[in-house]
Swiss-Prot record:
NCBIfam families per record: PRK14125.1
Coiled coil: none
Keyword hit for Secreted: no
Keywords carried by this UniProt record: Cell cycle, Cell division, Cytoplasm, DNA damage, DNA repair, Septation, SOS response
Gene Ontology cellular-component terms listed: cytoplasm
Domain LysM: 39-90
GO annotation (BP), single: SOS response
Summary of the function given for this chain in its UniProt record: Inhibits cell division during the SOS response. Affects a later stage of the cell division protein assembly, after the assembly of the Z ring, by probably suppressing recruitment of FtsL and/or DivIC to the division machinery.
Gene, per the UniProt record: yneA
Protein name, as recorded: Cell division suppressor protein YneA
Organism: Listeria monocytogenes serotype 4b (strain CLIP80459)
Domain of life of the native organism: Bacteria
InterPro entries: Cell_div_suppressor_YneA (IPR022887), LysM_dom (IPR018392), LysM_dom_sf (IPR036779)
UniProt cross-references to Pfam families, sorted A to Z: LysM (PF01476)
Keyword Cytoplasm listed: yes
Length: 109
């Protein structure tokens, strides 16, 4: 079969398969690129994972133990030890952290 005969006979199938491949690639790029919705916090002097859990676990809808386990796993902290100046990703969506930390100041008249 020549290319012309293959195209004439299977053009709908070829277009369908190519469309599926292109949409699949777009979907994979979108999902992989959009996975970083969690907040990153800087560890202060004297902070521990449990202190971060006390501060942020309520905003993540997780129990404190689950919060600490998640942070250890996602930040590759085998011993759970963090030092001042470290940045860790926490399971609190960026929008929740911004909303709760922001304040509104009214202008004086």
């Amino acid at each position: 079969m020549t290319m012309k005969l293959i195209w004439d006979k299977f053009y709908v199938s070829i277009i369908f398969v190519l469309t599926c491949i292109i949409l699949g690639i777009i979907l994979m790029c979108t999902v992989v690129g959009g996975g970083n919705d969690y907040s990153e916090v800087n560890v202060s002097e004297g902070d521990s994972l449990w202190a971060l859990a006390d501060q942020y676990a309520g905003k993540s809808d997780m129990a404190k133990a689950d919060f600490v386990s998640w942070v250890e796993k996602e930040n590759n902290l085998a011993d759970g030890h963090v030092e001042a100046g470290d940045s860790v990703v926490i399971p609190v969506h960026k929008t929740k952290l911004i909303k709760s930390d922001s304040t509104i100041q009214l202008a004086n008249q």
